[in-house]
């Protein structure tokens, strides 16, 4: 695949550092973002900004990293979308987390235009991208995947797992984010439990991180839990969307998911607790790790920052 003719759409918390890795790897990237100012830093290091998605219709590979399936559909098929231009990219690579049915519909519409879709959702956040510790899971036509594997691997420093045809990668990412929600909720619960028993959060989480239950994720989130730092990596709203996708998949495939259902209800309580804040909407734009505050509220436990920096493992 000609890596000198690649387009990229989406410059959010994930999209910008992902696209940056491609530019720094020497790929001649043409980019578009709804808010142009978010794309301008990449222009300074060699990317080219276009005026609309339609201007990317002539690229060989079109990559997207956006929030929802509706965003993907609008970018591909909408007014001034990529396919409103004069050409059709050969391969579409979508890194977004969207529903299985919506992805299948997008794939079918692209197939009518002789274009392939490779789904490549990722695991990690913006700091993981920059540290080269992002991973990806991919599905779609094997021939198309082989042509864009180098592009995906450039972004996913920990590697990409090809799992088969169609929307299988979507199922994997939905399952991944279901686990993300359940682990975060449980970690918040046991952290509040330990604190209420008298254990400082840093001491408890340090023990957990060094135990067989520790992980890249628990270590990374420790600083947030210890110092009440809700700098956004992933919002509660997006997590709720993914839990809903997981429950929908469970119903479709007749898989009981009681832990996921309980996590979804616990997360909903966080939206209610947000109404107690001075700026509920702004609060919900913060990080999903703030679930810790909702658990503490329900337990009648007061949280204060311990003001003790903790290494994230991504330094």
Give, region by region, the residue ranges found by the protein language model.
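ATP-dependent carboxylate/acyl-activation modules
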Residues: 310-315
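Rossmann-fold dinucleotide-binding core
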Residues: 75, 97-178
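NAD(P)+-binding Rossmann beta1-loop-alpha1 motif at the extreme N-terminus of oxidoreductases
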Residues: 1-65, 90, 95-96, 126-129, ...
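Hydrophobic beta-strand scaffold residues
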Residues: 29, 49, 117-118, 201, ...
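Helical "substrate-binding/catalytic lid" subdomain
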Residues: 167-294
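Rossmann-fold NAD(P) dinucleotide-binding segment
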Residues: 53-116
